[in-house]
């Protein structure tokens, strides 16, 4: 692990590992379209294959998405290696973004589609996966890092005020 931006690498490795492990497990347990109710009507594991982007946008004609995933992944690695030393929130944020991009990018290159399985039915949310969670957590970390750095930014210096001199006693007293 690089000594520079260590939280970046740790967050990326954990996100990639958790995404791969959960996808492999779900694919071994469920057939496409099959669902297991963990909390009936609220949260299910439902195996779906998504050839598009988030929420199945661009489904079917998304070959370019794998190249975007690769470009983003390479760009984030280069930034972590040759860019500035980042604060811990930024390191974790960019690392989680890398983990999500690699997780879904791997699926796109290996299978031509992304494995989704987390199904929140209570709010009718589109089915998603661990890489999607990593991307959203990464964005949240970057937002927190930005807000924290703004709150620590020192206020601009005030212009020097004119010195008021005390009157000197010229009466000798």
Swiss-Prot record:
Enzyme class of the recorded protein, top EC level: hydrolase
Region: Disordered, residue numbers: 151-173
Gene Ontology cellular-component annotations: plasma membrane
Coiled coil region boundaries: none
A Pfam family hit: Peptidase_A8
Alphabetical keyword list: Aspartyl protease, Cell inner membrane, Cell membrane, Hydrolase, Membrane, Protease, Transmembrane, Transmembrane helix
Function noted in UniProt: This protein specifically catalyzes the removal of signal peptides from prolipoproteins.
Official protein name in the record: Lipoprotein signal peptidase
Species name: Gloeobacter violaceus (strain ATCC 29082 / PCC 7421)
Gene encoding the protein: lspA
